[in-house]
Amino acid sequence: ANGGFTVPETVEGRIVEKLRQSSVIRSIARTTSTPDDRKIPIQNAIPTAAIIGEGSSITASDATFTQLSVDSYKYAARIVASRELLDDSGINLEEYVIRMASEAIARAQDEHFWDGDDSGKPKGVIDGALAGTPEITVTQFGTGNTTSLTSADATVDKVLDWVYSLPVQYRMGSVIVTSDQVLKNLRKLRNTAGDYLWQASPVERMLAGGPAGTILGYPYYISEYVDAMAANKIVAVFGNFNYYEIFDRGATEILVDPYSSASTWQIQMIVVKRSDALRTLDEAFVALKCSAS
């Protein structure tokens, strides 16, 4: 039929699952469904607790909160398929739309979830990291080298400083997100005993092509949207992504249009997914940045 409709819950669930599988950030972030735009309280610092004596006063907590607006940015994918393809190949139209739309929307969202500037797009993981007063802790290393890391421009000590700059309470469950190029160079770094920082996982040691290993004991994820090494670039983030939250507003909508491209015997399908995202606790993330020169 020609017109827009909200997909059934079963299809919606499969679309969200496909998005999660196709998006690096979505696969590790917290996700929440919300029916409308809203303001949410963001905790700027964890409160403290102390033992008090009987009859003693309880001092005020140092926890502070701000409010951030959660909007809904409309991600749309237009899929065009020939009737011959759908008819002759016996393709399940529902599966075809889910796969194609999910992959297209996931690519767009993954880019914005990484470096979105909160202006017409979600607030990315690294938004504010390059500000004069960074919103998240930044460890600087290197000399702007765009090809490799050496003892002259990036040492094991700097990588250790970066990882351990994340407060200990957030390290459990934390992961590293970086680019393939940076990972290659991080894997070449050795400690003074000659051991690589990168260690293969037990399964990878047993089976070729096993799951990825770790950097300093922490899992890593590769995103094509992380910058390669260059001056003043954020090239990796280590953090607890339970504190990066994706808000999906409402259900996915699909418009099936068999008429606009009827002269070429094609069907158009437009899929719309509304989402926003932001860091809910800045101190749960630390960035690794190439120096200016």
Which role does the model predict for each range below?
Residues G213-V256:
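C-terminal hydrophobic structural anchor segments
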Residues R99-A101, Q266-V271:
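Active-site scaffold segments
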Residues A1-G173, R187, A193-T214, Y220-Y221, ...:
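Acidic/polar, low-complexity extended loops/arms that serve as protein-protein interfaces
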Residues I176-S179, Y220, M269:
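Hydrophobic, well-ordered secondary-structure elements that form the walls
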Residues A1-G4, A287-S293:
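Intrinsically disordered, low-complexity terminal tails
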Residues M172, L216, G250, S263-I267:
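A short pocket-lining beta-strand/turn micro-motif at the edge of beta-sheets
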Residues V256-A262, S275-A277:
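Short proline/glycine-enriched turn/loop segments at secondary-structure junctions
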Residues I51-G53, G90-N92, R187-N191, M229-I234, ...:
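Short conserved micro-motifs at the rims of enzyme active sites and ligand-binding pockets
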